[in-house]
Amino acid sequence: MTFSNNFHRLETRLQSQVGRAIGDFNMIEDGDTILVCLSGGKDSYTMLSVLMALQKRAPVDFKLIAMNLDQKQPGFPEEVLPNYLKKLGVEYVIVEADTYSIVKEKVPEGKTTCSLCSRLRRGVIYRTAKELGANKIALGHHRDDIVNTFFLNMFFGGKMKSMPPKLATDNGDHIVIRPLAYCAEKDIASYARAMEFPIIPCNLCGSQENLQRKKVKEMLLEWERQTPGRIDNIFASLRNVVPSHLADTDLFDFNGLTTGLAKIGEDALFGQTAYDQAPLVFAGSHDDRIEFVRFERKPGDKSAEQAVPGEAAAN
C-alpha cells in the first residue's frame, strides 16, 4: 500500500493529537493493560492503529488487547474482525453476548434502541475488562462526539456536561479513556479511507440514528461551514471553564463574594476589546458632572502618561 505525503501529514497529526491527549490527561501509565474496544467502525479502527504506533515508541510499557463485542445482530460479519486482527498481529478477544434479542424484546417497534443497547454493551465491556485484568478501557469517541454530546446535554438535559477524555467507572474498578478526544472526525474519516479498514456497518440492528443527536450534528456542521474553526473553538472552551462567570453555586461561592477579593476578570463582565485602548482616569467632579480624561503614553515611555485635555468620557 503506497501513501501520499498528505497521508503522512495526516497520520502525524493524528498521532500527535492522541499523544497530546494521553499526556494532558495522564491516560496511559507504565504497566497498564488497555482494553481497546472495536466496533468495526472508522473511529475504533483509527484508535487502535494510532495506539499501536505510539506503543512502539512510548516511554512507558503498556499492553493492548483489542476487543469486539458480537451482539448477535442479523447479518453481522463474524469473520471480518478476527481476520483483520490476526493479520495485524495484536492480541484480541471476540466476546459473544446476545444483547440484540434483549433490546428487541424490551424496546417497542420503531423506537430507537441505542440507549438500552449502549447500557448492555457497557456492562459486558466492564465484565470483560475485569476478566482479562485490564485496568483501562479505551473508547473511540472523538472531538466532534464530545462537542455534540455537550450540546445534547445542554439543549435536552439542562446540563453543561459532555464525554470527558478520562473518567473512572461507577464502581471504581476501571478507568475509561478516549484517546481520540483531540481528533476531528473529518481527519479520522480521511485516515480510515486511506487505510482501507474493513468497515462493518453500524445499522445492522435496524435502529435509526437518534433524531436529537442527528439534528445537533447537522447544526454543528452548518456552523462549521459558515465559520470554519468554530468546532475547534467550542472544544477549546470546554478546556477553559471559568466557574466565577457562570451561574452554578456549587462550583463558585457567589454568596461569599464581597469587595476586597482578588479580581476575577472584569473583561468577561463588561466586554473585552481586541485593540489597545488608552486608559481613562478620573479628572474631577463639580456640580452634577464627573469628568474622566484619556491618557496617552509619551513616545518611548512605557510608564509616563500625559493627559489629553478636553476629552471627557462623561458629559
From Swiss-Prot:
Subcellular location: Cytoplasm
One of the GO BP terms on file: tRNA thio-modification
CDD domains named among the record's database cross-references: TtcA-like
Cofactor(s) required, per the database record: Mg(2+); [4Fe-4S] cluster
GO molecular function, one term: magnesium ion binding
Swiss-Prot/TrEMBL keywords: 4Fe-4S, ATP-binding, Cytoplasm, Iron, Iron-sulfur, Magnesium, Metal-binding, Nucleotide-binding, RNA-binding, Transferase, tRNA processing, tRNA-binding
CC cofactor note: Binds 1 [4Fe-4S] cluster per subunit. The cluster is chelated by three Cys residues, the fourth Fe has a free coordination site that may bind a sulfur atom transferred from the persulfide of IscS.
Pathway membership, UniProt: tRNA modification
Chief location: cytoplasm
A Pfam family: ATP_bind_3
EC number of the protein: 2.8.1.-
Reactions the enzyme catalyzes: cytidine(32) in tRNA + S-sulfanyl-L-cysteinyl-[cysteine desulfurase] + AH2 + ATP = 2-thiocytidine(32) in tRNA + L-cysteinyl-[cysteine desulfurase] + A + AMP + diphosphate + H(+)
Positions of [4Fe-4S] cluster binding: 114, 117, 205
Keyword presence, 4Fe-4S: yes
Record-level GO cellular component terms: cytoplasm
Record motif PP-loop motif, residues: 39-44
Family, as annotated: Belongs to the TtcA family.
Role description: Catalyzes the ATP-dependent 2-thiolation of cytidine in position 32 of tRNA, to form 2-thiocytidine (s(2)C32). The sulfur atoms are provided by the cysteine/cysteine desulfurase (IscS) system.
Subunit details: Homodimer.
Extra information: The thiolation reaction likely consists of two steps: a first activation step by ATP to form an adenylated intermediate of the target base of tRNA, and a second nucleophilic substitution step of the sulfur (S) atom supplied by the hydrosulfide attached to the Fe-S cluster.
Protein name listed in UniProt: tRNA-cytidine(32) 2-sulfurtransferase
Source organism of this protein record: Ralstonia pickettii (strain 12J)
